[in-house]
């Protein structure tokens, strides 16, 4: 446990000492809220509004709809990119020093994943400084549900990041592959647009995307979907169905947990063998 804590602590200290990284964690989400939220709010309402749902569209606030997606984006990108430190440590020789020590390789992998998980949750929580400016009401009940959900999602995504980092040898290669993965996963998760009326092949990609369930879980918690008008809930894409079954927050948490167990196992095995 001591070695896991030491690796976790190292990543946390590096995060807080990197001022540029802290600034960047605010800048990109802020730009997304301004450009997508404010600039496209009217267009999205017009596209989603139909003759049968005028009242629902009148109360559709795209900025509020998008905010949980921004949280998902921040947690996703931070979790995945946290594994970049593994590749950099390998390139600079630091990882070799750890590997020749009596520390178990599984402990190294778990320590790195927990470090990435914690940083991702911290950055996700920092986004709540924008809440007063977008008119969202966040209460204690929401946060009690949201924080464990964020830890669960960040753990799963950090495990995916470590799996990728264990398979790639250079920082440039890692960043290239991650960039290729990030945008399809984000845009097919419903983070920025309701995922309704998609073609069958795209629905399949949405269904197998772990980020879909993560973002939907965040939206249902933050927007308190169970209290929304049914028409508005439908318009916002919060009635996610898989194989004809409407998914609940519990279903989504269970799916993300199973993915997390699978990916941390694969990542630990791959990390142990590749180094």
Give the predicted meaning of each segment.
Residues 105, 109-179, 183-185, 244, ...:
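Alpha-helical transmembrane segments and their short interhelical loops
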Residues 7, 25-26, 66, 70, ...:
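Residue-level recognition of transmembrane alpha-helices
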Residues 220-275:
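Alpha-helical transmembrane segments of multi-pass membrane transporters/translocases
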Residues 31-36, 58-134, 186:
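Hydrophobic alpha-helical transmembrane segments of multi-pass membrane transport proteins
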Residues 1-16:
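A short amphipathic helical element positioned immediately N-terminal to and/or at the very start
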Residues 19-20, 64, 106, 172, ...:
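Residues that define the loop-to-transmembrane-helix transition and helix capping
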Residues 17-46, 63-78, 122-124, 179-187, ...:
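Hydrophobic alpha-helical transmembrane segments of multi-pass membrane transport/permease proteins
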Residues 34-45, 165-216, 220-221, 225:
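Transmembrane helix segments
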